[in-house]
Amino acid sequence: MSQDHGHQLTLEKSASEAINSNGASTPQYNDEEDLSTSEWKHLESKIRRKTDLRLCSIAGILCSLNLLDSGILASASVTSLFSDLDLQGQRYSVSIFIFTVASIVFQLPCTVAVRWVGPRPWFASITFAFGLITLCTAFVQTWRQMIAVRILLGIAMSGIYPGLTYLVSTWYTRREQQLRFAFLQSGEVAALATGYIVNYGLNLLDGRAGLEGWRWMYLVQGLITCVIGIVTYWWMVDFPENAQKSFFFLSETEAKVAVQRIQADRGDVVPDPFEWRKVLVNFKDPKLYGFAVMYFLLNITSTALNYFLPQIIESGLEFSSNESILLSTPPYYYAVLPVVLTSFLGDTFNLRSPLITFNALCLIAGYLMFGAPPVVPSNTSNNGSRHVALRYAGTFLATGAYVSNWAALNAYMANNVVGQWKRATTAAAVAACNGLGSIAGSYIVRNQEAPGYATAVWASVGSHILMIGIVIFFTIGFYVQNKNQKGGKVLQNTVGFRYTY
C-alpha cells in the first residue's frame, strides 16, 4: 500500500476506549491497517453517496408526511368537506390547531424515543400508524369525529420531523448538512406539489362508490403511507455507531470510517447514557430559545401557505376549486430550485446567517407582491390579468424562500449545537415552537379579508423582520465567542469547536 502521510485512519479496534469531551466512550483504533489520505477521501465520498441514497431518500419521503396532511386538508377545503362535516366558523382552524397541539406535546419524548427504540422500528411504526389514521379519516361523519382523528394524527406524526432532523445530523459533518437538509425539503415540497395533482385527480372521483372526492384523497394516500411505513423498516438506517444493524448498507471498514469522521468533526458520535437530567439541562442554553423563536416565526408563514394556498387562490385570485388545487402545485415545484441552490452555496462557502437573511428578504418581497393592491383600476381585462399574475408570482417567491430557510435553519442549528442529547433536545424544542407557529399561522388567513389578506401579509412580513434581527444578534454573539476561542477558550466543552455563522 502506498503511504500518503497526510491523513491516516487506523481500523483495528483497540481494547481500550477514549473518553470524549462529553464523557461518552468513543472507539479508538490501532495501527494494524492504515488508510492513506486518498483512500480516506475515497471512502468518505462513498459513505456520503450511500448515506444520501439510503438515508436522505427515505427521510425526504417521510418528511413529506409533514405536508401530506396539510396538502390533503388544503385541497379538501375547496371541495365539499366544509358542508359534509359542518366545518363552520373557526372549526377548520380548530382542526389545524388541535392537530398541532397534540404534535407539540409528544415531540420531545418521541424524539428521545428514536434513541431508545432505534430508527428503523421507530420510524416504521409511527409511519404505518400515521397512514392508518389518515386512511380512517376518510370515514369520519361529523366535525367532532374529525377533531378526534386529528388529535391521533398529531400524536402519530410528532416524532417524524424532529427525529429525522436529529438522525440526519448525526451522519454528516457540519459543512455537509445544509445540502442534505435541502434534499429533505426538496423531497417534502415535491411530494406536496405532486399531492396537489393527485388530489385533483382523486377529487374527480367524487361520488364513486358513494364517497366524496375529499374522502378518496384520505383513503388512497393513507393506504400509500401504510405501505411506505412497512418498507421503511428495511430502508431506514441506524445511527453511525450502529450502522451494522442496517440492511445492506455499509461494509465494516466504511462503518468505522463513518464513525471516525463524525468524531473528528465534533467529538460526539457516541451519546452519553440516557438520563432525563442530561436532556432537561439543555433548556438553560439561551441559543435553544433563539432557534425556537426563529422556527416559530418561519412556521407562521409556512402554515398560512400550506393549509390555505388553494383557498387563497380560489378566493383571492378568483379561480375555480379544481383550478385552485392545480395552481397550488407550481410554487412548490419551483421551491426545489432555490432550496438546493442556496444550500449548495451555504455548504460550499460555509455560510448560514447571510442565506437566512436573504431568504427572509425574499419572503417579505413575495408577501408584499401577493398582498399588493392594483396599481391602476382593473377596468380592462389586461390590467386585471397583470395584477393576478403579479400576486400569483408572489406565491412562488414566498414559497421558495420559506422552503429554503427550513434547510438553512436546520443547518444553522445543527452546526452550532454539540452533544447527542443536546441536539435531540434542541430538535424537539424547536419542533415544538415550530408547532406553535402552526397554531398562529392557522388563524392569520381570514377569508373575510380576501383578496388582500392583510393580516396574513403583515404578520408574515413582521415575523421575518424579527427573524433577521435574531440572526444579526446571533452572528455578533458567535463572532465574539469565536474570537474568544482563538484566545484559548473552549466552546461547548469541545476542544477545537467554533461556531458557524
What are these regions, as identified by a protein language model?
Residues 74-75, 277-343, 406, 410, ...:
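Extracytoplasmic gate region of multi-pass secondary transporters
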